[in-house]
Amino acid sequence: MIKYVLISALLVVAVYSFTIEDNEDALLEEAEDELDTEEERRMALPPGAVCIGHKSDCQCFGAKYKCSCPFLWRFRRSAKCHCRKGWAWTAIKKRSCHNRYQWSG
């Protein structure tokens, strides 16, 4: 019985430590996103330009343009993401962009 209690306690501690680590990573990502918003406000890439795949679609100019990456682009060095025309959902999603004033009419 005591073995089961100890194993359960160790399992809880392990899960808790992973949760704390994930929370720290999330806080770091939020801090980076806050820094990136200033950059997004200043610039918007034209259609067809090379964009950064792990950032938001707000970096591409236009309501319907999004950063589109090829399949498994993270594992291929030569693969680059480009600003390409998306669907209507892209325009709805980009309403919350900080630099939307650049392309909205």
From Swiss-Prot:
<feature type="propeptide">
    <location>
        <begin position="18"/>
        <end position="41"/>
    </location>
</feature>
<keyword id="KW-0872">Ion channel impairing toxin</keyword>
<dbReference type="GO" id="GO:0015459">
    <property type="term" value="F:potassium channel regulator activity"/>
</dbReference>
<comment type="function">
    <text>Insecticidal to house crickets. It induces an excitatory slow-onset impact that leads to irreversible spastic paralysis. It also modifies human voltage-gated potassium channel Kv1.5/KCNA5. Most likely, it binds to the voltage-sensing domain of the channel, suggesting it does not block the pore but prevents its opening at physiological membrane potentials. The recombinant peptide binds to the channel in an irreversible manner and slows down the hKv1.5 current activation kinetics. It is not toxic to mice, when intracranially injected (at 0.5 ug/g mouse).</text>
</comment>
<protein>
    <recommendedName>
        <fullName>U2-lycotoxin-Ls1e</fullName>
    </recommendedName>
</protein>
<dbReference type="InterPro" id="IPR013605">
    <property type="entry name" value="Toxin_34"/>
</dbReference>
<feature type="disulfide bond">
    <location>
        <begin position="60"/>
        <end position="83"/>
    </location>
</feature>
<keyword id="KW-0964">Secreted</keyword>
<feature type="disulfide bond">
    <location>
        <begin position="58"/>
        <end position="97"/>
    </location>
</feature>
<feature type="disulfide bond">
    <location>
        <begin position="51"/>
        <end position="67"/>
    </location>
</feature>
<dbReference type="GO" id="GO:0005576">
    <property type="term" value="C:extracellular region"/>
</dbReference>
<feature type="disulfide bond">
    <location>
        <begin position="69"/>
        <end position="81"/>
    </location>
</feature>
<keyword id="KW-0528">Neurotoxin</keyword>
<keyword id="KW-0800">Toxin</keyword>
<comment type="similarity">
    <text>Belongs to the neurotoxin 04 (omega-agtx) family. 01 (type I omega-agtx) subfamily.</text>
</comment>
<keyword id="KW-0732">Signal</keyword>
<keyword id="KW-0632">Potassium channel impairing toxin</keyword>
<dbReference type="Pfam" id="PF08396">
    <property type="entry name" value="Toxin_34"/>
</dbReference>
<keyword id="KW-1220">Voltage-gated potassium channel impairing toxin</keyword>
<keyword id="KW-1015">Disulfide bond</keyword>
<dbReference type="GO" id="GO:0090729">
    <property type="term" value="F:toxin activity"/>
</dbReference>
<feature type="signal peptide">
    <location>
        <begin position="1"/>
        <end position="17"/>
    </location>
</feature>
